[in-house]
Amino acid sequence: MNTTVSGARIPIRPDDVVLAVLPFFHVYGLTSVLNICVRHACTMVLLPRFDAAAALDLVERHGITRISAVPTMLIGMVEDPDTGRDLSSVSQVVSGGSALPQEVLRRFEAKFPRATILEGYGLSESTSSVAVNVSREERRVMSIGKPLWGTECRVVDAEGHLLGPGEDQVGELLFRGPTIMKGYYRNPEATAATLVDGWLRTGDMGYRDEDGFIYVVDRKKELILRGGYNVYPREVEEVLYEHPDVV
């Protein structure tokens, strides 16, 4: 189901060549790379252990068109010093697993002249993606896009009350839909704490804008209370990445 709805949201063709750098034992690599390539009969080029230089060599050698990766991999490819490779075959990059700094997105798309980075979001408990941006024209930078087909999202406060749209309406992200797990194996207590009336509690803090795009602020556990203000590590990281002396 997840492979089908993900492929419908971000179209993939049989002539696509996908760089497989994510482990297949993880739900992200299993669903968004292996299963989607099998489902749509496209070519996969395997890289068993990630190395930025090796990944870029494969891009040039095989004419890679699509990459699914985590931000640390994209950072490695951006910072590789060899600028002589032809990377123009890459048209689409899906980033997930953690937040992608905006400065990294800018530098990556400058290095890969035809590439568009699309951020998405998912969990093992949701069998991978529940939301994703779909194109350069429609994406909202810093957002994880909109829910996939059949999936709903709501934002709630600490008491479980529904929050409306707006950057000042930060709460926990909850998802409900056909790809959400039935429960944890032989662990009814954990299941009851995570699934509430069919809604998956993600433990991630975020908000929605007026157009339905979802923004992840940070993990609920990582919120820092300082002088009456909510400080999220991701916001600090964004500022650091923009500083010219930070590599």
Cite the ranges covered by each PLM segment.
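Conserved AMP-binding/adenylation subdomain of ANL enzymes
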Residues: 2-17, 25-66, 80
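Phosphate-coordination loops involved in phosphoryl transfer and adenosine-cofactor binding
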Residues: 14-15, 90, 197
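Gly/Ser/Thr-rich phosphate-binding loop
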Residues: 39, 61-69, 78-140, 149-152, ...
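AMP-binding/adenylate-forming catalytic core of the ANL superfamily
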Residues: 59, 67, 177, 182-186, ...
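Active-site glycine-centered loops adjacent to acidic/histidine catalytic or metal-binding residues
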Residues: 97, 122, 145, 204, ...
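Short Gly/Pro-enriched turn/cap motifs at secondary-structure boundaries
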Residues: 142-148, 194-197
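Conserved beta-loop-beta connector loops within the AMP-binding
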Residues: 154-174, 193, 210-211
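AMP-binding/adenylate-forming core of the ANL superfamily
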Residues: 166-181, 199, 205-206
